[in-house]
Swiss-Prot record:
Sorted UniProt keywords: Host nucleus, Host-virus interaction, Transport, Virion
Subunit structure: Interacts with protein M1. May interact with host nucleoporin RAB/HRB and exportin XPO1/CRM1.
Protein's UniProt name: Nuclear export protein
Primary location class: virion
GO cellular component: host cell nucleus; virion component
Superkingdom of source: Viruses
Compartment(s) where it occurs, according to its Swiss-Prot or TrEMBL record: Virion; Host nucleus
InterPro entries hit by this protein: Flu_C_NS2, Flu_NS2
Primary gene name: NS
């Protein structure tokens, strides 16, 4: 009977040893996965930061925002001005003139007149781009949430939590902007 007890104890010790070895393998595997996620997240953050929003000054320096005046619109301007003044006189509202004037003088990045771009199409393009930005931010937030799992350094953890908060707030702002455009 004592022989069976020794065998069962040895068997239990063997199983426990194997379980511990397996757990160590899993821990090593998990650590490797976390390290891979960290490096891929850092790479993504570097990629995302290369596309960081630029200031208006930078855009002007790069001549992205150019003022261009189409000569055909200048030729039509006296006629449009007269029509707008007639409408303004008819409605007794001079306030119509200023927004229309500023709208017609506003230049587009695409060098097109505002009147030549349909409002619905422009809204659709803006909404599409905002939704794309939002989806990329959601992917970044997901990757940051995965990276949090294996962080042992408190500074990295604080940085990731801060970046997740920034992502979430930006996503909320973009969604709010999309809703206001709809």
């Amino acid at each position: 009977m004592s022989d069976k007890t020794v065998k069962s104890t040895n068997l239990m010790a063997f199983v426990a040893t194997k379980m511990l070895e397996r757990q160590e393998d899993l821990d090593t595997c998990t650590e490797m996965q976390v390290e891979k996620m960290k490096t891929s997240t850092k790479a993504r953050l570097r990629t995302e930061s290369s596309f960081a929003p630029r200031t208006w000054e930078d855009a002007i320096k790069d001549e992205i925002l150019r003022r261009s005046v189409d000569t055909s619109s200048l030729n039509k301007w006296p006629e449009l001005k007269q029509e707008l003044e007639n409408v303004s006189d008819a409605l007794k509202a001079d306030s119509l003139w200023l927004p229309m004037k500023s709208l017609s003088l506003y230049s587009k990045v695409s060098n097109q007149e505002p009147s030549s771009i349909p409002i619905g199409e422009m809204k659709h393009q803006i909404l599409t781009r905002l939704k794309l930005i939002c989806s990329r931010l959601e992917k970044l937030d997901l990757n940051l949430s995965k990276a949090v799992l294996g962080i042992q350094n408190s500074e990295d953890l604080i940085l990731i939590i801060y970046n997740r908060d920034v992502c979430k707030n930006t996503i909320l702002m973009i969604k709010s902007l999309c809703n206001s455009l709809i």
